[in-house]
From Swiss-Prot:
Catalyzes both the ATP-dependent activation of exogenously supplied lipoate to lipoyl-AMP and the transfer of the activated lipoyl onto the lipoyl domains of lipoate-dependent enzymes. The gene is AIM22. It is an enzyme of class 6 (ligase). It comes from Saccharomyces cerevisiae (strain RM11-1a) (Baker's yeast). One of its GO terms (molecular function) is lipoate-protein ligase activity. It catalyses: L-lysyl-[lipoyl-carrier protein] + (R)-lipoate + ATP = N(6)-[(R)-lipoyl]-L-lysyl-[lipoyl-carrier protein] + AMP + diphosphate + H(+). Residues 146-330 form the BPL/LPL catalytic domain. InterPro entries: aa-tRNA-synth_II/BPL/LPL, BPL_LPL_catalytic, LipoylTrfase_LipoateP_Ligase. Keywords: ATP-binding, Ligase, Nucleotide-binding. This is Putative lipoate-protein ligase A.
Amino acid sequence: MSMMLSNWALSPRYVGQRNLIHCTTLFHTLTRWAKDADDKYHDINSMYENMFTPSNDNVSILQDEGKSDYDTTKTSSMQEDISAFNKDLYNFYNIGYAKQIMSASQLENIVKAKGRFVIQSLSTSPYYNLALENYVFKNTPRAKRGPDNCRLLFYINDRCAVIGKNQNLWQEVDLAKLKSKNFELLRRFSGGGTVLHDLGNVNYSYLTSREKFETKFFNKMIIKWLNSLNPELRLDLNERGDIIQDGFKISGSAYKIAGGKAYHHATMLLNADLEQFSGLLEPSLPNNMEWESSGVHSVKSKIKNVGIITPNQFIAVVSERFQKTFKVDGEIPIYYCDEFKSINDEIKDAMNTLQSEQWKYFSGPKFSVKIKDKGLTIKVEKGMIYDCDRNDLIGLEFKGFLENIDSYT
């Protein structure tokens, strides 16, 4: 793996991966791969499974405790067709199920036991992925002696804007533009600023003990690993600990420390649709509003894609280097999760919290806003107006007030 990244990216294994990503005719691509398939392509071929993973609309999950398979009595005909097609592909081409997805009980046993591992989520649901990350963090045991239980998690989210736990969302995002471009809004469980995700962005989360935690450590490792593959990448670290390339930010970070453990999670812009990001972090608010908030304010930065690395290549490289660098006793395994099998009540509860309007709009810091030309000052806590120059506004939801501001002012 000491060769230049440009050569590494053209190896047969990764050319196949890139062809898969850019293919226009799925069946012809599958056929071409099947003819050349052997054991060394098995991991690449397994990526076909992701293409046929059903959406939440097409799957009903068994709710009974101890069960983790699909409820065949409630499964839609579309899901049955997808499953049948996957099985046909597997039987004919010997591909499709190489990535063994953990059941809920397997996930619980692995996370709550001591040891180091890598988890890759095959889901693109931001609600599931953030809930999974939270589950792994909360349930990782503290090492009383010996090596700490450091873990690495990867996930790729569909379009979404993710604000920090302690941010005033109305100062961070344009809700109307998010809706028009089909971006979900999430408030995560950690601090930090607002970031935008799509399928061209990889999120990684490094978990370790509080004693071993250092905010810039893992990004330094990322830079070292990627630059060693291709020095032309010229990745560097800025004073905030973000990864930059040619002065442009390609990775943003956030952190959480609790219960003697800590994690650093970050984005990596690889081939994101940056055009779609335009304007989403520029709230369309009246110019006569003056804000005061104790919350965290995002730092605006120029961004770009790394460009010559695909998401799957990035995950493969960082996983391999993590396995080699953090190996203690035995190999560090890689596990796979999705929102259909690798889910339990704790993850579901976290997903419900993330999806709730209460968490999105009625949490966050206290703030006040002055409407200058109206001589009006409004104070807000937990999304509710609790103090104002006009008594008739006290007790209103700030969200509703802002959506109908002309009628109130």
